[in-house]
Amino acid sequence: MAETAEPEGGAPSPQGPPEGSALLEERPGEPDPAGPEASEGAAKAPSGEGAGAAAKAGATEEASGGRDGEGAGEQAPDAGTESGGETPDAKGAQIEAEGAPEGTKAPQLGEEGSGGKQVEESGPDCELRGEAAREAEGQAAAPAAPGAQEEAVPGDSVDAEGSIDAGGSVDAAGSVDAGGSIDAGGSMDAGGSVDAGGSIDTGGSVDAAGSVDAGGSIDTGRNVDAGGSIDAGGSVDAGGSMDAEGPAGGAHGAGGEPQDLGAGSPQPRSEAVEVAAAENEGHSPGESVEDAAAEEAAGTREPEGSEDAAGEDGDQGRPQEETEQQAERQEPGPETQSEEEERPPDRSPDGEAAASTRAAQPEAELSNHLAAEEGGQRGEGPANGRGEDGEASEEGDPGQEHDITLFVKAGYDGESIGNCPFSQRLFMILWLKGVIFNVTTVDLKRKPADLQNLAPGTNPPFMTFDGDVKTDVNKIEEFLEEKLAPPRYPKLATQHPESNSAGNDVFAKFSAFIKNTKKDANEIYEKSLLKALKKLDAYLNSPLPDEVDAYSTEDVAVSGRKFLDGDDLTLADCNLLPKLHIIKIVAKKYRDFEFPPEMTGIWRYLNNAYARDEFINTCPADQEIEHAYSDVAKRMK
């Protein structure tokens, strides 16, 4: 961070213990941190006292009959010293208005205590020169305030209505004029020092809507447009005058409220230094200070002091792009926004430009806020995919479109999925449809009362669809195929009617086979079961009409399809596969019966089903199936 010399008359930075009047003397031999430019600006001042004395002398020389402004120069203890160097404690800079002698008058809130305001009100040059001279003489003769260990500089008076606390903020309700005075409507926080030794020419005034946090010092040698607050972590070297929307652009509130500057939060320290560094190219620190003092003394500067006056001077003007960039970097705080609502509108060109900048920022924030809310609403959505009016959402909406709950038989532990081919049948259909649904297992041993009231006298499976209770399995299948239809949901009906009847007698043959307890009759029941299985196997190995190419000379001997009606699962598979799986598990467990290896169609069919999530994730555990038939598959005698 670049460091610049503090102009004379500024409050000392808060480092080192107070040393009384010994610190009023210049420190010989200390290096000038501001470089050649600061030394050149200081050399232009009468009596060699620096930019602050030069500005004061230029403003009061004609009025006081050639007085060389040495009163301001005698009280500059830190001329040429480094910002933040070894200076008295910040408490030495506390000048309490209520504790000052009678010769020093602290202006009340809303009063103008600066030369810039007086120029606007008085107008004639004679009143300007006389008032500046009286102010300088009166403040030079006044003794230091009690408790203050450093005298107030006449060219740089600090009029504080409250107290000047170390660690607070500078709320400049008044204006900073050529005399360098700061009218603090609230309190001044000398965290470092606010150095106004040179003249701060605002054409209007410097209105800090936020706070001036001077961690180092503010060397006003150039033009700084304070669209909001000035946060000088090190030192801000402004080559011209501090240009802001002053009283000419819009009147202050009755209570000395700061004027609307479009931003209230402090500007980031690094950004403030970058802006000051960009503005400081090609200008010496005291260059515009002397020009400002000379123009005010000659009565040539306009009191309106916004960008119009500064823009006509090539040295003092600043491109509009820099002003817009600085305004964009400042974000208004909640306190500033509340103050802006109470202040009258700014009618000056700069005020209108600042208002447009302020208006653009909330619109962008509101737009982003609305976009964020709309994005959140789209992401969350209704839980069941339905709008407030109860209508189903649009096609393709990933949300839940219907409120569906499937009640299935619970296992012997009362929680897991139990053995029930009809429950698995509906489970597979809902899964294949791709609809969002809930599954509730029902323990038949202790059926809850609410379920008894929901479907009295009905055992699982049953279903609720958007509040309607469905209990018949075959009708539920038809209802789901009709309600959850394409294009939103896949069609599960078969293309070939023969697929619906294939294997329809297998489960009945199996039930007779597993319930038989007579060894003599076992062979009969087993042959009956094998006959039904061979019929099913033959259908699975027989090519479907769409598998046969009418233009091919080769006959397809064996089908290669995965399921009953083709390579996709259908309603026929949802009915047959759960039963075929139960036959495979129970016959092996209790009758040591397996599907013959030569039944390649059945084995291909089962293996393809075991590779599908819709089947294996709806199947009960093998132990559940075996446990369910433990009482049925009695030992043969």
UniProtKB/Swiss-Prot annotation:
- List where Acidic residues composition bias occurs: 305-314
Q: What class of enzyme is it?
A: oxidoreductase
**Modification after translation (UniProt):** Phosphorylated.
What residue spans carry the region label 15 X 6 AA tandem repeat of [GEA]-[DGR]-[SN]-[VIM]-D-[AT]? 155-244
Q: As annotated in Swiss-Prot or TrEMBL, what is the tissue specificity of this protein?
A: Expressed in brain, chorioretinal, lacrimal glands, submandibular glands, airway epithelium, kidney and gastric mucosa, where it is preferentially expressed in cells that secrete or transport water. In brain, it is highly expressed in choroid plexus. Not detected in pancreas, adrenal glands, heart, skeletal muscle, ileal mucosa, liver and lung.
* Localization (cell): Cytoplasm; Cell membrane
Q: Which UniProt keywords apply?
A: Cell membrane, Chloride, Chloride channel, Cytoplasm, Ion channel, Ion transport, Membrane, Oxidoreductase, Phosphoprotein, Repeat, Transmembrane, Transmembrane helix, Transport, Voltage-gated channel
In terms of domain of life, where is this protein from? Eukaryota
Q: Which Pfam families match?
A: CLIC-like_N (PF22441)
Enumerate composition-biased segments (Basic and acidic residues): 126-137, 315-332
Which Gene Ontology terms of cellular component type are present? chloride channel complex; cytoplasm; plasma membrane
What regulation of activity is recorded for this protein? Channel activity is redox- and pH-regulated. Inhibited by IAA-94.
Q: Which GO terms describe its molecular function?
A: chloride channel activity; D2 dopamine receptor binding; D3 dopamine receptor binding; D4 dopamine receptor binding; oxidoreductase activity
Region called Disordered, residue ranges: 1-400
| Keyword Transport tagged | yes
Q: Where is the GST C-terminal domain?
A: 466-637
EC number(s) from the headed UniProt entry: 1.8.-.-
Q: What is the catalytic activity of this protein? A: chloride(in) = chloride(out)
Motif (G-site) positions are 420-423
Subunit structure comment from the entry? Monomer (soluble state). Interacts with dopamine receptors DRD2, DRD3 and DRD4.
- PANTHER family associated with the record: CHLORIDE INTRACELLULAR CHANNEL PROTEIN 6 (PTHR45476:SF1), CHLORIDE INTRACELLULAR CHANNEL PROTEIN 6-RELATED (PTHR45476)
Q: What is this protein called?
A: Chloride intracellular channel protein 6
